[in-house]
Amino acid sequence: MFNQFKRLIIGKPKRHRELKNEKISKFKALAILSSDALSSVAYGPEQILLTLSIVGAAAAWYTLPIAVAVLILLAALTLSYRQIIYAYPKGGGAYMVSKSNLGEKWGLLAGGSLLVDYILTVAVSISSGADALVAAIPTLYSHKVLIACLLVLFILLLNLRGLTESATVLSYPVYLFIVGLIVMIIIGTFKVATGQAEPHMQSAVGTAVPGVSLFLLLKAFSSGASSLTGVEAISNAVTNFKEPGPNNAVKTLIAMGSILGFLLVGIVGLSYWYGILPQEETTVLSQLAKHVLGQNVAYYFVQATTVMILVLAANTGFTAFPMLAASMAKDKYMPVMFTARGDRLGYSNSIIVLGVLAIILIILFDGKTENLIPLYATGVFIPFTLAQFGMVIKWIKGREKGWAVKLIANAVGGTITFVVFMIFLITKFNQVWPILIFLPIVVIGF
């Protein structure tokens, strides 16, 4: 009876020789591995505005230079992870880079940070999706935590059925979200260029605003940098790509970075033009869609796809966590159970463990996204920083052709990500202090 139920839910077992058929194309990989990063535009620009609004609406123009700074950081991270993919074609990302160049303990810190971050990816994304859902259907509010837990179980079961099936199902909502936002930005830009959209800026660029300090701007920048969570996922899953894996992974990474940069700049720029400010009962993205598209079918399409991608962003964690756990298990830092493939050739044990831990987090934090995001964003900048400086050491030791330019790029990127991490730590210490306790325990446990 149990086996029959298992086959109904998960599907028939696959032979190991079918593993090569589990490799995914660039088209599917962009959806399955980029949903986390791309979905962050739904809250990243809003986080910048929320921070600046402390000193008043006139400070909104600072979102423009801050968005440019985030774009520069995105370019640095994309370049860094492009180099990491070619240097470490078997995957592992920041874990392999740190372990190989900085030493075992730093590698374990990077690996532990990423594992924790992937758990938080699932918890944050699912909680955000549940928030959006209950906002649309208020009668479900009292069941928000239960809804979030059920959504985790749905994504968990989808991944237990196998990677290719998961990628096929999840690719459609992600591309609908991308197309919806790109069309919205193009229409909005056209209206601005042709004078159809009256400017409602809160203040002109360059306006001196009392209360704005370097500390506030850095805090706003770090909040905006939450839009970059998930950028590293592709480097951890190179072996999931069809051959040639590294080349396909790099092309997917560049496509993701380009789309993310376009969406971020478009949303920030149009939000400034329309004078949009954060409101308690709605989101910045929702306000922008309403201004540009009107409250019609197109508006609800953007809202619906936003909800879907926030939920499906959790799938990035379900893809990257098992790959990283398998790499660390092969290095004897985690139980061998994490290297075992299930009936459908996925790392079933990792998938189940990740789902259970994410559900526990959602219950502990009562599904409150605002309390999870600081931990989430802070944790991801640890492996970002270690990966960058690990590559710096690699270039110094190897001194291969073009090493100086690569070294400078990684050194600048590493410095920026370290500064962002410290800003998070200092400005939001009361929310992120568990990172300082939990990560050392994880490393010692390895």
Task: Name each model-derived stretch.
Residues 175, 179-229, 427, 431:
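Helix-loop-helix junctions that connect adjacent transmembrane segments
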Residues 1-55, 79, 90, 98-105, ...:
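Membrane-interface "cap" regions at the ends of multi-pass membrane proteins
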Residues 3, 49-99, 104-111, 124-151, ...:
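Extracellular loop-to-transmembrane helix junctions
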